């Protein structure tokens, strides 16, 4: 597939997602990094977003809860270029009914080449990166060329 460049803006659109057993871990991470996160636009699945907003007072664009389609909503935003970073603390020790949605969300984040953290250490690396508050170019699939090739 041919690639093109997308610029992640200095003010990032960050999706925050956590499975039930990981919500407290994400909450602690968000509270620790609140001064930095407040400079960006936050999205989250339903329960997680409401918990973050209630605990911190930050504005969070809450989707539906993950099992009700929230993971797919976040995935759609990623494919539309509206999410720049995904922080997703998923529980590797417990299966969830919407596992296919989880896999699809991670697949879309990979396809569209956005930074993804699935644990605290990686989330810390991303948010502490010297480029976190900078505009950054990434390579993404050239969908228009892909579509044109498919329609030949």
Swiss-Prot record:
Pfam families: MGS. GO terms for cellular component: cytosol. Keywords: Cytoplasm, Lyase. GO terms for biological process: methylglyoxal biosynthetic process; protein hexamerization. Its EC number is 4.2.3.3. SMART domains: MGS. Residues 6-152 form the MGS-like domain. Changing residue 91 to N: Causes inhibition by substrate leading to loss of enzyme activity. It catalyses: dihydroxyacetone phosphate = methylglyoxal + phosphate. Its main location: cytoplasm. The active site is at 71 (proton donor/acceptor). Inhibited by inorganic phosphate ions. Competitively inhibited by phosphoglycolate. Competitively inhibited by phosphoglycolohydroxamate. SUPFAM superfamilies: Methylglyoxal synthase-like (SSF52335). Changing residue 101 to E/N: Strongly decreased catalytic efficiency. This is Methylglyoxal synthase. The lineage of its organism: Bacteria, Pseudomonadati, Pseudomonadota, Gammaproteobacteria, Enterobacterales. Optimum pH is 7.5. One of its GO terms (molecular function) is methylglyoxal synthase activity. Catalyzes the formation of methylglyoxal from dihydroxyacetone phosphate. It is found in: Cytoplasm. Belongs to the methylglyoxal synthase family. Substrate binds at residues 19, 23, 45-48, 65-66, 98. Changing residue 71 to E/N: Strongly decreased catalytic efficiency. Homohexamer. The keyword Cytoplasm applies. The keyword Repeat does not apply.
